[in-house]
Amino acid sequence: MGRVRKSDFGSIVLVLCCVLNSLLCNGGITSRYVRKLEATVDMPLDSDVFRVPCGYNAPQQVHITQGDVEGKAVIVSWVTQEAKGSNKVIYWKENSTKKHKAHGKTNTYKFYNYTSGFIHHCPIRNLEYDTKYYYVLGVGQTERKFWFFTPPEIGPDVPYTFGLIGDLGQSYDSNITLTHYENNPTKGQAVLFVGDISYADTYPDHDNRRWDSWGRFAERSTAYQPWIWTTGNHELDFAPEIGENRPFKPFTHRYRTPYRSSGSTEPFWYSIKRGPAYIIVLASYSAYGKYTPQYQWLEEEFPKVNRTETPWLIVLMHSPWYNSYDYHYMEGETMRVMYEAWFVKYKVDVVFAGHVHAYERSERVSNIAYNVVNGICTPVKDQSAPVYITIGDGGNIEGLATKMTEPQPKYSAFREASFGHAIFSIKNRTHAHYGWHRNHDGYAVEGDRMWFYNRFWHPVDDSPSCNS
């Protein structure tokens, strides 16, 4: 055989690159990354991350969320364990000596043989945009001080960054995930949480002490930046065998959402605006069929979105519609059939889901051509459709989903069974950068990434496999 000339070698390389690029754009990527995992078990209740704050009846499990549609209010929530104590929040702007007071409401609940502490929820309204606020809870020796930033004023070219976490739980891997996110120099200004919080329901009798331990574990983040809550199957806590017949009982007592502000009738589906984004939260485990409250609300909600004001349209849900893992395969199908045509019509930019304990990103696809007789039931590329991202890889006790359907479907652009978190950084009305971070990588490493082009302002092809 003769020697290969340099020109021939260059041509071969070019051809191989073109072939590889073609394969990636049509078949997607299944990562073969080898994971180093801690034990997939929950941390014991005496772990440092669950430590109760010092002092009698000190406020604990502090968390905040957005308190209205526009982003000028927050809801501060906390628990006092021994007694009701004060339901007051003192707050003030940075570099200001003028302090304000807000008073909240307190509730308790019982779940089988568990009785909760005193759960406080206090709305703080009429805040200024783009401002740092300090706030204090408790009295005397048990006062605890925290802070948060309000979002910038709503507008199309305001930069804003979201963190993304799902299915977190309270295992050793959960701790790695939250620590990795908290220490990420590019971490979000708010967290979009796609459901499955404490996994208390995996314990006998849904041991609600695990709701308390999770609240203390996550406080290092939830007390300082708003977490936007989505409900998952592990928030249902429906246990008629022990006399607990009310779904979502612990969640609805412990966590608040601004659902009334957006015209919703339940706290499980609602919408908010934050900077340049319009965020719609849907409930995979509440009724969503035609004529249900959630269906009617969403039908009226999409036309309200003003893309000249909030160009980025983001949807959160728990159960993914496009999932190529064996776990929970096709579970989101009935909801997809009900709502997907609206997602395409209104040009949703991205959908974030959890439930599957792994990571996956889709191409822009839709599957709305099917009817009972035409047999057209295969997803197709659709530049008016959203990218679907499954980020249920927070690290919970149930472990990773490692079994995938083979061959990899064409709608799947990238998938990997690893724990991690993601960052969605909106730059302006046309561009946003997305990156997924494995737990065991350095912060500069993005295990997956994509530049998003806004579907309303810049609807050019941003096929993930070809542009990541």
Swiss-Prot record:
GO cellular component, one term: plant-type cell wall
Top-level enzyme category: hydrolase
Superkingdom field: Eukaryota
UniProt binding sites for Fe cation: D167, D196, Y199, H357
Binding site for Zn(2+): D196, N233, H318, H355
Transmembrane feature ranges: none
Residues annotated as signal peptide: 1-25
Catalysed reactions, as listed in the record: a phosphate monoester + H2O = an alcohol + phosphate
Pfam families tied to this protein: Metallophos (PF00149), Metallophos_C (PF14008), Pur_ac_phosph_N (PF16656)
Biological processes, Gene Ontology terms: cellular response to phosphate starvation
Keyword RNA-binding: no
Classification via SUPFAM superfamilies: Metallo-dependent phosphatases, Purple acid phosphatase, N-terminal domain
Conditions for induction: By phosphate deprivation, mostly isoform 2.
GO MF annotation, one: acid phosphatase activity
Protein family according to the UniProt entry: Belongs to the metallophosphoesterase superfamily. Purple acid phosphatase family.
Protein name: Purple acid phosphatase 10
Organism: Arabidopsis thaliana
Top-level taxonomy: Eukaryota, Viridiplantae, Streptophyta, Embryophyta, Tracheophyta
Gene: PAP10
